Amino acid sequence: MAQDITLKLPSGISAPTQEDITAAKEYVLERSRAEIALASAVDGILKEYAERMIRVCYKYNIDPQSFSFGANDSMRQEVYAILDDLLEELLSLIEEDSVPQNRKNKHYGAIISWLATLGTHNKDLKWTTQYYISRFSKDVEALVAAMKYAGYDVNKAVNRSKSILHTLYISPEVLSAMKSGKMFNAEGIISGGTKYDPFTHKPSVGLSKYGATNLVTMARSTLAKAWMESEFMEAEDEGMGGYYVFRGSSYPCSHICDLECGWFHPMSMGMVCPLHSSCQCWVLYVKSDKGEITNYRNLNPYML
């Protein structure tokens, strides 16, 4: 992050101190560390649940080409029970770890209630998590079929799964099954990992073909939003008049981040950050001496 900033303030705004600037930058860095920790935890859980599903599937003597979760009712019920457990564990982890200082945060209840409303397709967090878990399950189904086709025993399949959940459809085992010319029942082998929007029924746009990647990204994004909302609530309590957004990285982002940088955002506008799933922009709150200020756009919206 840049060490110095130049900011032309409109009249009626108290200038922030260097301590304010340093704290604002450090807050986003601390948030990034929390994101990485949560992503690692989610990834570990997904590997654990993939193993549970693989071990269940290997108990049933189903040949690779005929294999799918629906090939045996008992197996399907066992797998779905595991997926239900996964949903509960992920939601609990994401909600608990996404709030800065956890239950010590005085806004904990409000942030948890707000988090529950977040999601894709105008749905909430639970629906979104279920949706991505469904996509993840299709990957595990394809993985089992491919490992069986490769002749792997259950332990080798489990060990292999831990390194390819985010690259499954370019792994040698899955590629071998897809290119074999044989008919498979596992959906991921048939489609090559392509998944479809549940409403348009067209190939999904803007999502990874890997369910594990979607779940990790969603967890990180949810935490980032919670941290920025928590900071915003604290600023409201302190009577701040608004804030400025500054770039936290030099990555080109002219169509999103740059458009929000360098101009005054009144508190009534709400919190705009994070602006995308990997946004590192930081927010500098300022006090208003004369009520609400008209939005002011600085001539140079870039990080200095």
Predicted segments — roles?
Residues 178, 189-294, 299:
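Acidic, glycine-rich two-metal-ion catalytic cores of nucleic acid-processing enzymes
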Residues 1-205, 287-304:
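N-terminal leader/targeting and assembly helices and adjacent pre-domain segments
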